[in-house]
C-alpha cells in the first residue's frame, strides 16, 4: 500500500503504528530483531485479505530509544509527530515506564513488548503489554515444581533487586498455595560472588529444588556453589538467566532451567512457522524473544482493529481491552490491567547450551514439550 491515502473509503482501513526499540548500543540486536519482525508482519498483513493495511510511521523505521529514558522520550515524540493510532514498544522496562506515563497523558495506545515491570500498565487504561509481568514467572516456577512432584524447595534471592524480590514473592506465595514446603529462604546481594553459605544451608534444609531468580552474571557462580555444596537437584531462574555463561561448568548446569517468553525450538506450529519465515529472510542472529514479541504486537493491533471496528486509537483500545490472542508467544489473554496471562517456555541446558524443554499454559498444564 502507498503511504498516501488511497481512494475514498480506504482511509478507515489503515492502521498507523509507531514502533520504538533499542536500535543502537549494546542492545542493538534487539532493535534489529524488532525491525525485521515488524517488516515481516506488515508485509504479510498488507498482502493478505484482512481488509486492513498497516502503515509504520517514521518512514517505516523503528525509532531508537538507545536503552536510555531521555532518548526514549525523543523517540516517542518523533513517532507521535507522525500521527500514529498506536505505538508498539519498548522492550526494556526502564525506557518504557516514562513512555507509558506520557502515552497515558496523551490518550495514546501503547503496547509494550518486553517491559515486565508491574508498574508499566498501571500508568493508564490505554497501556497494554504482550509479555508476562515479573511476578508471573515466580508463579509459573511454582507450578513447574508442582508438575514435577517436588515437595521441598529452597529460594535464594537478591534483596537489593526489585526483579528478584518480585519473582521470589510470587514463587513463595504460589508454593504455599499448592502445599509445597519452603525449607529455606536465603538472601544475597546482586553484587555477591560467594554463595557457599546459602548453598550449604539450602542442602541442609533437605530441599529438592532451588529457585534463584537473579541476573545472568551471578548465575554461574551460584550454580557452581550449589553443586559444590552437594546439591544434586533441580535449580531454576527467570528470564534474566538468558545468556548466562556456562563455560567450564557445563556438567553443573545439567538439570537447571529458566523461564522465558518463548523458545525458537518450541514445536508449536505458530512458532515453527515464524522461525522458518524469519530465518529465510534474516538468518538466526537476531531471532530472539524480542523479535517474536514485536511480530505478535503488530498482529494484535490488527485483531484490535477487527474487534474494535475501526483504526482510530479509541477503536483500537476498545478492541485491545480483554483481548484473547494466539501467536508466536502462545495463547494470550489480556487481564483487567492490560497484562498478558500467557503460556511460558521452560528452557534447560544440555552440555551447557540452552535447549527448550517444555511450554506450560497459565494453569501449569503442558502445552508442548521436547519429544
Model-derived regions, located:
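Beta-alpha junction/loop-to-helix N-cap segments that form part of ligand/metal-binding clefts
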Residues: 14, 29-34, 47-119, 130, ...
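Periplasmic-binding protein-like
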Residues: 19, 79-91, 111-113, 154-157, ...
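An alpha-beta-alpha
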Residues: 23, 127-190, 209, 301
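Extracellular/periplasmic periplasmic-binding protein-like sensory domains
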Residues: 223-295, 360
